[in-house]
Amino acid sequence: MGGNKFYVTSLFKKLMDRLKKLYSEHTFTIEIDDSYEKYGQGGIFSCMSFSIINPINKNYVLISLFDNWKYHFMKHLGWEGKKMKQFFYAGGFNFLDYFDFKQISKSNTDLEFPENISEVFNSFFYNPYFDCCYDEITTLYNSNDEKKDKMFFRGWMWDFRKKMVNGIDRDDILIFDKNQVSQNLDYISYLKEIKKYLVSLSLPGGTEVCNRDIESFSIGVPVIRPHLQINYDDPLIQNYHYINCYHYCDYSKDGNPKFISHEDFQKNLIYTWDKVKTNKEYLDFISKNARDWFLKNCTIDNNLNFLLSKINLELLH
């Protein structure tokens, strides 16, 4: 897909500029290592994370949009959990999965955790893929074009996603795999396509919430998805901001969601879709609530202001 600027790039650049102004008594130096690939995308030099480090004692604040929070406790990737004083994560983190992961990983000497995660963890808000096209997004939200009465998904159909929908064969449920030829679209075309349909299906990926969720919120297309357990300060409420089709999604063991039964998930998905698809008043209700949540939390400036209100550099001493 194409766009002007990646959201993560814009957010981190603006964050750096604001930090320099707010803390003019300090000197901020950007450290980038082109060899970050040896650590991988979840390593300390990943473009998906931003660390504020005290060079004297190496204490740090971590802000991450990487799609697997477990990597941030792995020593071979360069992280030191005991020196992590604040951990800001947007994609999906809850304490049940964290403590389960910690317990089942007791014998893994590569892992290092903070002394008290409840004092360290902070949420901030997930985002659309690109920082662009806000006029077009608003135009799409306000458009009243007739919709196709279908539930729609376009994305990477990894094996764990295929298991979620294998065997579903209905004309009113459309699933397009971007791994297939000619199934990847430029960004605006992608948003316009979502807007054509009654409901956007969100199949979780490497982390609980997806760019697709936020993009669908932004253009006013109701999202059907499994329950979100994210600890946002402004909570995403099931059946108010999005339509919940399944009660639980476990991320404690791998970077992929686990369900009690894929067959059970499919039954609940179809049941929920059939229940809501003719209820225009309810779908409009979800659409408005989700759009309001997006505007309040997910635009660059609002998300940045929220982050800056929570970052505490005194903890780095």
Task: State where each predicted segment sits.
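Nucleotide-sugar donor-binding catalytic core of glycosyltransferases
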Residues: 1-212, 218-219, 224-238, 248
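Catalytic binding pocket for nucleotide-activated donors in carbohydrate/polymer assembly enzymes
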Residues: 189-315
